[in-house]
Amino acid sequence: MRVNVTLACTETGDRNYITTKNKRTNPDRLEMKKYSPRLKKYTLHRETK
């Protein structure tokens, strides 16, 4: 079952991206390097509730 998750920047706390993930294959929190428009660079984004 795929669910929508929000990704938040670890440095600014901005919630910049929405993506989907499969909870059965990825039960832990999702982490991705994504572009942060406020910092104008790539930063680590983590899944939020």
From Swiss-Prot:
Matches recorded under Gene3D superfamilies: Ribosomal protein L33
Taxonomic superkingdom: Bacteria
Record flagged with keyword Ribonucleoprotein: yes
A Gene Ontology molecular function term of the record: structural constituent of ribosome
SUPFAM superfamilies referenced in this protein's UniProt entry, alphabetically: Zn-binding ribosomal proteins
InterPro entries for this protein: Ribosomal_bL33, Ribosomal_bL33_CS, Ribosomal_bL33_sf, Ribosomal_zn-bd
Keywords recorded for this protein, A-Z: Ribonucleoprotein, Ribosomal protein
GO biological process terms on file: translation
A Pfam entry, by short name: Ribosomal_L33
Cellular component GO terms held in the UniProt record: cytoplasm; ribonucleoprotein complex; ribosome
Record-stated family: Belongs to the bacterial ribosomal protein bL33 family.
Protein name: Large ribosomal subunit protein bL33B
Organism expressing this protein natively: Bacillus velezensis (strain DSM 23117 / BGSC 10A6 / LMG 26770 / FZB42) (Bacillus amyloliquefaciens subsp. plantarum)
Lineage: Bacteria, Bacillati, Bacillota, Bacilli, Bacillales
Gene name as annotated: rpmG2
